[in-house]
């Protein structure tokens, strides 16, 4: 279902990430070079074009609606304007065997007032980016569905390498949600390097306030990004819990960085603070 990569910095994206983007999405590559706002259309196999310090927005296509070919490679011009649109997702009510859904949407939205675009696109559970080649600007829509890693925005995470996740609650061994980590690699046990408030009210809640509470006990797993997306759905990221990177001191003494979920809406005021969940 495609991937959009937004790299508006001078860093390089790991070659393995670019290669996987090409393999998973083999049906066309569109590139907007953000230093010139020139657009390039090519085959996905030419992903090495992105092995550069230049800033860009790239769209690797996985065809679900419309034929495979450069004519259906994103981004698409919106009418006769200087605006172009790319999408990660599928709108089944648009497009046909020849023309992809995003191409139809680009023509459709070009007839609407520019100020209405955000509201129109937010009705779809897809990720969008529009680019104005005259003003040299771009806009991300449904940004909460994107993931930012090392300063780069990704519309899907299945092209990214595995990451570390520290879990302190029902995702630990012996608890109900551990099933989501059954295919992940257990790295070991440790504690948060900084102190955080952990409260327990039937379920555990870790609060993002450093130097309050305890060094909380966690289990660390190496997970792929499809699993990470499952964890995000379970935890209601980024609204109920929010995933953030913190340092974990492993029992072996090793210090590593891992994603940990912090509750967003609850207060720990006047509540008992714990070191661990389970056997507490």
Regions found by a protein language model. Name each.
Residues 1-46, 56, 145-153:
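Extreme N-terminus nucleophile/cap motif
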Residues 2-6, 28-34, 74-76, 84, ...:
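Short beta-strand scaffold segments in enzyme catalytic cores
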Residues 10-11, 109-127, 135-146, 151, ...:
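Glycine-aromatic micro-motifs
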Residues 31, 89, 105, 231:
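Residue-level signal for inorganic ion chemistry
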Residues 66-69, 94-97, 174-182:
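Cytochrome P450 core scaffold surrounding the K-helix E-X-X-R motif
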Residues 66-86:
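Acidic loop->beta-strand submotif enriched in PP2C/PPM serine/threonine phosphatases
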Residues 82-96:
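Conserved beta-strand-loop-short alpha-helix elements that form
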Residues 94-110:
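Helix-start/capping segments and mature chain N-termini
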């Amino acid at each position: 279902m495609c991937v959009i990569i937004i790299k508006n910095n001078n860093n390089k994206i790991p070659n393995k990430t670019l290669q996987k983007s090409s393999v998973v999405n083999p049906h066309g590559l569109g590139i907007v070079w953000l230093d010139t706002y020139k657009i390039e259309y090519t085959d996905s196999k030419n992903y090495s074009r992105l092995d550069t310090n230049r800033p860009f927005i790239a769209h690797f296509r996985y065809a679900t609606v419309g034929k495979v070919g450069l004519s259906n490679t994103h981004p698409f011009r919106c009418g006769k304007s200087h605006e172009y649109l790319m999408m990660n997702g599928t709108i089944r009510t648009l497009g046909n065997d020849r023309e992809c859904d995003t191409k139809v949407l680009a023509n459709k939205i070009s007839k609407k007032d520019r100020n209405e675009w955000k509201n129109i696109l937010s009705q779809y559970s897809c990720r969008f980016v529009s680019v104005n080649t005259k003003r040299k600007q771009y806009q991300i829509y449904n940004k909460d569905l994107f993931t930012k890693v090392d300063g780069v925005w990704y519309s899907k995470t299945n092209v990214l390498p595995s990451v570390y996740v520290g879990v302190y609650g029902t995702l630990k061994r012996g608890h109900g949600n551990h099933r989501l980590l059954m295919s992940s690699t257990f790295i070991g046990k440790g504690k948060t390097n900084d102190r955080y408030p952990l409260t327990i009210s039937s379920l555990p809640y870790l609060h993002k306030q450093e130097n309050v509470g305890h060094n909380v006990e966690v289990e660390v797993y190496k997970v792929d990004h499809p699993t990470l997306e499952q964890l995000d759905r379970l935890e209601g990221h980024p609204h109920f819990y929010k995933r953030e990177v913190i340092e974990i001191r492993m029992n072996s003494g090793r210090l590593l960085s891992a994603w940990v979920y912090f509750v967003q809406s609850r207060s720990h005021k006047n509540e008992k603070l714990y070191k661990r969940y389970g056997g507490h």
